[in-house]
Amino acid sequence: MEPRAPPRLSVSSPRRESGATVPSHSPSTLLSCASSETATEKRRRWTGVLSVFGGVLVHVCLGTVYTWGTLAVYVVSYMRLLQIQSLQAASDASTLLERTSEEDGSSLSVFAFASAPSLVRLSDSAWVLASQFAGMTLGMPLGGIAQKTLGPCRTVILGGALMSLAVGMAPVLLHSYALFVTVFGVIQGVGLGLAYTAPLLCGLAWFPEKKGIVSGAITAGFGTGALLFSPLQAAFLNPLSIAPSQAPYASHPAELYYDVSDSDQLEILLRVPRLFRLLAVCYLLLVSAGAALLRVPAASPGVRTPGASACVFDEEAALVKSLEREEVRDETREEARATVSVRTALVSWTFWSLWTLFFLNGLAICFTASFWRLLAVDRNTRAYILTETQLALVGAAASACNAVGRLAWGHLADKRGFQTSLMGLSALWSLLLFFLPNAAPKGGLCYALAVSGSFFCLGGNFSVFPSAVASVFGPDAIGHLYGFIFGSQLASSLGFAYLTQRVAQTIGTDGLSTLMGLCTALTAMSVFCLPALSPTPRKRHSFQKQS
């Protein structure tokens, strides 16, 4: 028998574990395989990039939840107008009306009603943001379930439609604060939750090795939403930048509302219902555009057809490198599929440690998003230190920092671990919250920097915590487990709303800011001290053994 020629060096397909061999190919076949590989890789990458961009568009719409900090004074003032009109129509206290009319004119009767204890106040506006986060907490697990049957595109459109419906119904509910909170708050929040996780899952499925960057980029859209919409809303409602001037409560001189007895301020309030209708249409169009770009990679993108699954090489080292990169991606995907079950995670100390830390930072999130404008009031002059236009610019800058913070802290989580990122974020935020009550008296620039820095830290939470869940429990856990972690925001939003009713009336917004600074400081110290959050590499393997 003639001796066989030595076999040519070949690279096997992913099926090589079963012993399958791959025949050699001619140089022309090799070049065709390489070019086909390159073209396919480019198409896949662009599809992934477009899917991430679609997720950004969706989150831009969802992020308009943070425009409530700008809208609150207008909406609450309009509610007070409706309530005052109702009180005037139903009041039998004619002697009060006659006395006030004789002393100071008819406008004083309006002021008498403006200080009525039954009227909604700015401190009550915290319940709106709290109810929105509560609805998001309920909607996120439903979104994870819905996308398994409906797919990401239809799930996002369903959530966006529910959100737009809630915003569109708001004008007919402004007469009742309870109904407004239920629909504009809870139901809109459920729509937000339904549409929130699907873009993240799509992005992480395309780029599982870049958890922090992908989650940061998509959720940066959440911060950009307020950046884009807050100035537009302020320009539509208040093009002349007229500041509120009515201070009906002597014990809280910084609590200012728009005066319905002033014709210019009344004209501002009458634009509120039309704004909600316009926003409803814009939200639905924006969500639909983003959802149309969402795509999910194939179930096993590393498996190729037999004819193109392997190539033989002689001197073509470039093709070898391409296949090696594909093997690395295959290993990453196999690791991504090894996800901890919900049952195992819910009984772990790590889960409840993350839940508690998100709760503590969630209190500061609610405070920063709801009360940043109130800290711009000079307590001595009872006036804002900035004009309405300047406040809108501060809000836009803060929203930009919100978006940038998600990218920056997410990138740090990728490079140094989520523990380092979360500890640095919370420590910096604590310092800013301690300083924020004293920022306005030092000047508008100082106030703007403090607010922007606070939003820079606020945004980081929404990229660091998803990155933490993916790092500890597996990337696929974002869909079914992050919703439970986000449940801490239900507790923190309700807890903050309770604090504003019980504590804020005593310690004021300055004391509340200091209290929130203590919460974020506790988060920073807990990350450093809790053994459940120690930065052990491969921590997830211990969970997998338990499951």
Curated annotation (Swiss-Prot):
Bias kind Polar residues: ranges: 21-33
Gene3D superfamilies: MFS general substrate transporter like domains
SUPFAM superfamilies referenced in this protein's UniProt entry, alphabetically: MFS general substrate transporter
Location of the protein in the cell: Plastid, Apicoplast; Membrane
Keywords: Apicoplast, Membrane, Plastid, Pyruvate, Transmembrane, Transmembrane helix, Transport
GO biological process: amino acid transmembrane transport; pyruvate transmembrane transport
GO molecular function, one term: transmembrane transporter activity
Residue numbers on the Cytoplasmic membrane side: 1-45
Disulfides per UniProt: none
The protein's role, per its UniProt record: Along with apicoplast pyruvate carrier 2, forms apicoplast pyruvate carrier (APC) complex, which transports pyruvate into the apicoplast and may also transport amino acids like methionine, serine, glycine and tryptophan with low efficiency. Required for maintaining pyruvate-dependent metabolic activities in the apicoplast, such as synthesis of fatty acids, isopentenyl pyrophosphate (IPP), dimethylallyl pyrophosphate (DMAPP) and methylerythritol 4-phosphate (MEP). Required for maintaining the integrity of the apicoplast. Required for normal parasite growth.
Subunit structure: Interacts with apicoplast pyruvate carrier 2.
Family, similarity comment: Belongs to the major facilitator superfamily.
Protein name stated in the entry: Apicoplast pyruvate carrier 1
Species annotation: Toxoplasma gondii
